[in-house]
Amino acid sequence: MNKKQQAVGGIQWGRMLKKLNPYTIQKGFRYLKHYGPKEFWIRLHERFEPEEVPYGPWYEAYIPDAAELEKQKKHKFGYTPQISVAVPAFRTPEVFLRQMIQSLLDQTYPNWELCIANGSPEDTAMAAVLKEYSSRDRRICVRNLDENLGIAGNTNAALTMAGGEFVGLLDHDDLLAPNALYEIVKKLNEDRQLDVVYTDEDKVTTDLSEHFQPHLKPDFNCLLYTSDA
């Protein structure tokens, strides 16, 4: 193994160890049980193989700094639609639940509502966290379901809570960049005929220190959208 291979291997294992926690281990076991060892190994390789083009430096170069975020908070749009963010939640680890909610509270665009359908009625700790935030900010709405309805049922329950002009879906362990809703509303102000806005996405480590595996989506292409690609 040459020095380059050693370095790459070190990065792979270092990244893997950095992402290991009870939640990711549990998800890994579920994936292994559902898809089998072959698909699990392919997935593991995809997640931890080194990036051909480093994403971290690009990300750091393009994220808005504190001054830009403050400028966005003061900006007045002519059109200020309410955006509902629907979240189906089920046995969400507290660290991810708090990070997800905080990412909404950190938005530079203020006219949003967070609609959480809680499918874990037996999880008193999770209910306490949700009550803590919903009592603090009226934009955070929680519906405690009588039982877990599954991902589809919980999602539909969250969607029924939405009262905004636009609705977005967010997984219970996902985050929004602080300027995410601002950029969406900026685009809606540029073209009032828009019905749908889609965005790029990436993954982030549990401690939020490293962004990786970006999914940078192309401009809208009707032929591509309707193809099997």
Which residues make up each language-model segment?
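N-proximal low-complexity "stem/linker" segments adjacent to membrane-targeting elements
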Residues: 37-102
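Short alpha-helix within the catalytic core of nucleotide-sugar-dependent glycosyltransferases
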Residues: 101-102, 127, 156, 164, ...
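Acidic donor-binding segment of Leloir-type glycosyltransferases
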Residues: 105-144
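Glycine-rich, basic loop-to-helix element that forms the pyrophosphate-binding segment
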Residues: 145-162
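Short aromatic/hydrophobic "clamp" motif used to bind/position activated sugar donors
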Residues: 167
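The conserved acidic donor/metal-binding loop of glycosyltransferases
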Residues: 171-175, 200
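Conserved donor NDP-sugar-binding/catalytic core segment of glycosyltransferases
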Residues: 179-211
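Conserved small/polar residues in nucleotide/adenosyl-binding loops
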Residues: 225-229
